C-alpha cells in the first residue's frame, strides 16, 4: 500500500509540475539535440487523450522455463494505470503511462514510461503499430531500486480500444532464468 501511495504521489507531483509550467517554451533549458524529445513529451502531456490501462497476462516462454518453474509463476499479471496519448501529424502514436501490476512472483511492480509506435492504418477504425517503450520500473527481487529499460512494443488500435504487447528478454542460464516474458495489456482512451 505504501508503494501505491508513493506512485500516486509522484504522478500527482508530475501533474502539478506540468500544470504550474507557465513559460511559453517549457523545453528551453534542454540540450539542443534533446529538445525534440522534450517537445514531443510535452505535446503528448498537454494535448493527449487520457487513457486507462489494464494488464492481465504475462506468458513465460515455455522454451526457457521448466514446467515446475512455470507452475510457480504468476501469469495473471493483474493491474492497471493511467496515461496520456496522441497520434501525431504522421499518424504515429506517442504515449506516456504509469502502471502497476503483479509480477511473476505476485509482487507489486510499478512502471512509468514513454512509448512510440509507427502505425499503419488497416481501415478507418483499425491501426497496427510497432515501436518501443522507454521506462523505469522497480522490482522486489532487485531491492526496489529504480531500473531503467527499453522494450519492443506492438499494438492493435480499434477506435478507442487498444491491445498491446511487449516481450521482456532475459537469460536462460541454468539456475538464473529471468525475463523471457510476453506481457499483454489493454488501453481505453477516455
Curated annotation (Swiss-Prot):
Signal peptide: 1-18
A single MF term (Gene Ontology): acyltransferase activity
Swiss-Prot/TrEMBL site (Role in lipopolysaccharide recognition) positions: 69
Keyword Transferase found: yes
Protein's cellular compartments: Cell outer membrane
The reaction(s) this protein catalyses: a lipid A + a 1,2-diacyl-sn-glycero-3-phosphocholine = a hepta-acyl lipid A + a 2-acyl-sn-glycero-3-phosphocholine; a lipid IVA + a 1,2-diacyl-sn-glycero-3-phosphocholine = a lipid IVB + a 2-acyl-sn-glycero-3-phosphocholine; a lipid IIA + a 1,2-diacyl-sn-glycero-3-phosphocholine = a lipid IIB + a 2-acyl-sn-glycero-3-phosphocholine
Name the record gives this protein: Lipid A acyltransferase PagP
Native source organism of the sequence: Legionella pneumophila (strain Corby)
